[in-house]
C-alpha cells in the first residue's frame, strides 16, 4: 500500500492559495452546460470529482474547451444532445445527484454508475422526488442506490414535489437545478422539504449560482422553494469559482496548531460557502483569526497554556469542515462534542466510524453515537500511528494535522486526496516546519 510519512512538525506558517471549490465547480459546470450561451469558468478545480463531471458532460454532447484552470462551456439551451450514454461518475455525489435529475427530464436512455462506495450512497429520496413528476428511473442492483437506468418519460409538474431533507441536501439541490428545464402549471414548480434540511449552506450555494445564470428561486424558510419552470438558464459570460472553503479548514487549523501566521487566500467574508463558518468554530476554540473579503489569517492560539478550548457544537450546517474540528479536538484541554453529524455516515465512507477508529490510534478516547462524536484528547499523542483513509480525501487531509503535535504520523493511501485536492500534501509540506 502507498503511504506518506509526515512530521514531526513544531510550527506552520506562510500563505496558501486555495484550489477552486468542488461544490461550486460541479454546480457551475452543469449550469453552464444547460444554459444558453458560452460561459468562461475560471479557477475551476482540477480533481477526480470535476473530471468525472467534465467527462460525463462531454459524453452528453456538451462542447468544452479546457486550458489549465479555465474552461469554456458552450451551453445546450436546456437539453443534452446525446440521447443515450453510459456515465461513470466515480464517487462524486456533486456529479451523480444533479446529473441524475437533469437526465431524468432529458428524454433519453442513460445508465449512471460509479465506484463500489457510490453504490452504497443513497439516492432514493431524489429518485422518489423525480418519480413524482413522471420520471422513469430503475435501480439496477439495490433499491434506493445507484447504478440507475434512466428512460425517456413524460414529465409534468402538477403538484408540489416532496423530498426528504435529512439525509443529504444534494437531493434538494438536484431538484432545484433541474426544475427550470420542465414545464409546470402556472409556470412555477414548488418543492416542499420533509423533515429538517441538513447542510443548508450548500443549498444556499445552489440558489445563488442559479441566480447568476438568471433563474431566481424563492424560498419560505428552508421548507418550501418556488422555482420558475419552463425557463432558460442564461450564461453570465464569465464566472470565477471561489476557493474551496472545506479545503481551507486544514490550513486554518494548521495556523492555529502550528502558531502561524498562516494566510489562506481565496475565501473570506464574501464567500458564498457555509464552510467559512469553520473559522468561527476555530475562534470559539481560542484561535486568533482575522478575516478579509477573500482571505483568512490565523495566528496561533490566544491562551497562555497554548491549547485549544474544547468545543460542544451542532455541526449540521458544516459537516465536512466539522471533520477538521474532530482532529483539532486532539489539541484541546478537555473533551469536545460534535453534534448533529448523521450525514457523515453516508459520505465517502462512514465518517463517524472511521474518525472514531483513527482518533483512537493517536491516543484519544472516543465515544461514537448515531449522530455525534465525543473526543477526549490524550495527555500525549501516540507517535507513528498509521492512519487508514478509507478512500476518503477528507480523512487523509484531516489527519495530516496530527504531525503538528510534534509526533510523526503515517497516512495510508495518500493519493485519495485527488478527489478534491491532488497537491494537498505538497502545499501542507511547504507550510509545516520541524
From Swiss-Prot:
Protein name (Swiss-Prot/TrEMBL): 3-phosphoshikimate 1-carboxyvinyltransferase
Record carries keyword Nucleotidyltransferase: no
Cited Gene3D superfamilies: Enolpyruvate transferase domain
Pfam families: EPSP_synthase
A Gene Ontology BP annotation from the UniProt entry: chorismate biosynthetic process
Protein origin, superkingdom: Bacteria
UniProt binding sites for phosphoenolpyruvate: 22, 93, 121, 170, 351, 394, 419
InterPro entries in alphabetical order: Enolpyruvate_Tfrase_dom (IPR001986), Enolpyruvate_Tfrase_sf (IPR036968), EPSP_synthase (IPR006264), EPSP_synthase_CS (IPR023193), RNA3'P_cycl/enolpyr_Trfase_a/b (IPR013792)
Location of the active site: 320
UniProt keyword annotations, A-Z: Amino-acid biosynthesis, Aromatic amino acid biosynthesis, Cytoplasm, Transferase
Localization in the cell: Cytoplasm
HAMAP family, per the entry: EPSP_synth
Catalytic activity, EC: 2.5.1.19
Enzyme class: transferase
